[in-house]
Regions:
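NUDIX/MutT-family hydrolases
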Residues: 125-126, 130, 134-168
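Active-site segment of metal-dependent pyrophosphate-handling enzymes
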Residues: 91-132
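The catalytic Nudix box helix
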Residues: 67-102
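N-terminal strand-loop-strand
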Residues: 1-67
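Short aromatic/basic micro-patch
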Residues: 66, 118, 149
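C-terminal alpha-helix
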Residues: 170-178
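Short, charged/polar surface micro-motifs in flexible loops or helix N-caps
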Residues: 16-18, 28-31, 73-74, 104-106, ...
């Protein structure tokens, strides 16, 4: 079994009296490996649970909404990888607040060798600093159909993977209990 180390971020901002989180939609033709365990345009309109339900009702298939994350490069620290992945996949820069938790799961690669992979993803709560959501390179469009702001309160209902839903809940709990943010 192969081991993979990844890192990702729950990048948040406070705007108009609400907390918002940066999320990405995977391209419709991508087929991400779903975890086997229970432990995973420059102008964009914000997504809420109500608008997502309305939009997906008319779609052929429900979009896969997830948190920005990716492999930790050799010699790179998990936090640095999380900051890099958020920047590459969403177009925004952010600063660390706190490590939320690690998600651990096993999946089978759907490409190449079909190898079983034990994956650990370290997630960090990050605060938006600058940039424009969905301002990503053309090369990233293979991985990201679009990036958008989602109400943090709605995120656990909107995200596709159980572990990422848990990270959104932890982030929401943290911002609600830390008024200094």
């Amino acid at each position: 079994m192969v081991r993979e180390m990844s890192a990702g971020g729950v990048a948040v901002r406070h705007k108009d009296g609400d907390w918002w989180m940066a999320a990405i939609e995977l391209p419709r033709d991508s087929n991400p490996a779903k975890p086997k365990s229970d432990s995973e345009s420059s102008v964009s309109t914000p997504l809420t649970a109500k608008s997502a339900k309305r939009k997906t009702a008319s779609s052929r298939s429900k979009p896969v909404l997830c948190l920005p994350k990716g492999l930790v490069d050799a010699g790179e620290k998990a936090l640095d990888a999380a900051l890099r992945e958020v920047r590459e996949e969403t177009g925004i820069t952010s600063a660390p607040i706190v490590k939320l938790a690690d998600i651990k799961y096993v999946y089978v690669r759907s490409w190449g060798d079909g190898e079983r992979v034990f994956k650990i993803v370290s997630f960090y709560l990050l605060r938006y600093e600058s940039g424009r959501i969905d301002d990503v390179s053309d090369e990233m469009r293979v991985e990201v159909a679009r990036a958008r702001w989602v109400r943090l309160e709605d995120a656990p209902k909107l995200l596709a993977y159980r572990g990422e839903k848990q990270m959104a809940r932890k982030a929401l709990e943290y911002v609600k209990t830390h008024s200094e943010l």
